[in-house]
Amino acid sequence: MRLLRASAVMTTLLLLLAACSDSGSGGEMLSELGEPEGELNLVIWAGYAEDGSAYPEFDWVTPFEDETGCQVNATVQADSATGVQMLQSGEYDGGSFSGNATDRLMAGGDVAPVNVDLLENYDAVFDGLKNQPHNSLDGVPYGVPHGRGPNLLAWNTDEVDAQTSQSGLWEDAANYEGQLSLFDSPDFIADASLHLMATQPDLGITNPYQLNQDQFDAAIALLEEQFTHNPQFWDGNTFADQITQFAAGDITIGTTWQYQVNSLLAESAPIDSVKPEEGATGWSDTWMISSQAAHPNCMYLWMDHMMSAEANGQATVYFGEAPTSQAACDYAESIAPGHCEQTHATDEAYWDDIWYWSTAREDCADDDDATTCVDYDGWVEAWTTLRGS
């Protein structure tokens, strides 16, 4: 028996679609929806489109397909840069993207603005997730929220004392030679600069993603020192390997997501985690529709589905993210008691010191023409050099 059942909202929306003419294009904001096209091609983060094949109790794809007739074809992106390239290929109707991709997609015209009046579940989304820099442009929504979470610090409680700050990754890294676990992405440079915000305030860093040359050089120097201690790496495709490494005792401390922590706790592994007192980087992911979408009606139906209590509740429990509405929280609690408290879904103050992934820009993402920052190409080049050293 499937855990999830199609909602009355979805049924109502489909009836409305049948009464409307085919929109025919995903290039501009839609004024109305037409008949579902029968197919939906998505770029996703791993775990964002589960059909019950991995765990029968987690299935929000099959009910969507049964109710709408839109057959979901999902392709996993390894990282945000790959996701951007995939959507730009024109082969996908949309996808789930983090802030370090959404700003590029909006700026490049690769995604279309979203008519949220056509999405019945949008009104219920927490206000703190709406009209944010990572999902809106000039006050116009370019997507709908999926979930959010911090990049946590985790450690093996048998080997490491309780942590409150990131110092274990930086100043104390020599204590964990060969057993550090780090996120393998240029975006990890922001974790270094966030630590410098707290420990070297004279650098004047005010945004860990927008760094002038001196600030950037300081972050790279910190990483160069850290890399001398032979860290191990994981990314959006290999986070399961981090679970295995923690469970086996091959790593003792590192950055992680709630998903890995929950998986390890379920195995009774000696693991604990914290949002460091300096704050943390993190993500707030968004479902967006391609400006070249071949199946825009199915994409709109999917975006609305992913804000429903059942689908969002399941998806955020599955990945250890904060649900996007009170209704989704209530559903999440019914299948995973304590989930919304654990993920701070309704505690907006918790997110005040979480810096969602964003793209480094030459103009420093501000209105001061006198400031110049190292752009993302510079971050990629530096990270490639670091990883090759």
Residue ranges and their predicted role:
Residues L15-A19:
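C-terminal motif of bacterial Sec signal peptides marking the signal peptidase cleavage site
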Residues V43-P56, S96-Q245:
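Extracytoplasmic ligand-binding site segments that recognize negatively charged/polar headgroups
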Residues D285, S290-W357:
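Mature extracytoplasmic/periplasmic domains
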Residues C20, G27-L105:
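Early extracytoplasmic/lumenal segment of secretory-pathway proteins
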Residues E120-V125, G149, I220-Q226, E267-S291:
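Periplasmic-binding protein-like
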Residues A101-M106, G254-P270:
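A ligand-binding cleft/hinge motif common to bilobed small-molecule-binding domains
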Residues W351-S389:
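Conserved C-terminal helix/tail region of periplasmic/extracytoplasmic solute-binding proteins
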